[in-house]
Amino acid sequence: MNTTKEIIDDLKEGKLVIIVDDEDRENEGDLVCAADKVNSDIVNFMAKHGRGLICLTLTKEKCSILGLKQMTDSNESSNKTAFTVSIEAKEGITTGISAQDRATTILAAVNPDATKKDIAQPGHVFPLQAMDGGVPVSYTHLTLPTSSWV
C-alpha cells in the first residue's frame, strides 16, 4: 500500500495506480490515471489488462458543461453508478474504438475549454458522474477528490 501523497505524486506524473474500493461496494480494484495525462499506451494497457470498460469520472459541473445526461432516468443498478451516455470526440478520431481514439476523446472531454460542441454521443468512452462529498462518502474512484480520472 502507498500513502495518499505517493499516489497523488504518481498520478501527477502520469502513472497508473490501482484504487481498491470498499469491500461492501464492488470489492474490486480499478486502474486509475489522471485524465489529463492519458495517452494511447495507457488506454491500451487498461483495455488489455483491466478487461473492463474505459470510464471517465467527471464532476457534476463538467457533466453539465458537456451536456451529459444520465444513461437512465431510473438507476436500478445495485451500486447506483452514475453512468452518463457514452461519448466520442467530434474531431481527431476515426472509428472511436482504438486506444488512440479513446485517449483523444478523454482529452477532449477534460479540456478546460470543452463544451458540448466538442463531444458526440454515443461513443466508446463511458463517463461517470462523481459523487458529491468526496472520499468520506465512500472509498471508490467516483469519490476521489479530483476533477477527472480515467
Annotated model-derived regions:
Residues 148-150:
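Hydrophobic alpha-helical segments, chiefly the membrane-spanning helices
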Residues 1-28, 32-39:
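N-terminal, positively charged regions that mediate nucleic acid binding
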Residues 42-99:
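Glycine-rich, N-terminal phosphate-binding loop and its surrounding beta-alpha-beta segment
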Residues 20-23, 35-36, 50, 58-61, ...:
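Fold-independent oxyanion-binding glycine-rich loops
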Residues 6-8, 43-46, 70-76, 114-117, ...:
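A generic local secondary-structure boundary/capping motif
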Residues 15-18, 30-31, 52-56, 82-85, ...:
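Structural motif
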Residues 140-146:
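Conserved small/polar residues in nucleotide/adenosyl-binding loops
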Residues 76-130:
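Hydrophobic alpha-helical hairpins/lids featuring a short glycine-rich hinge
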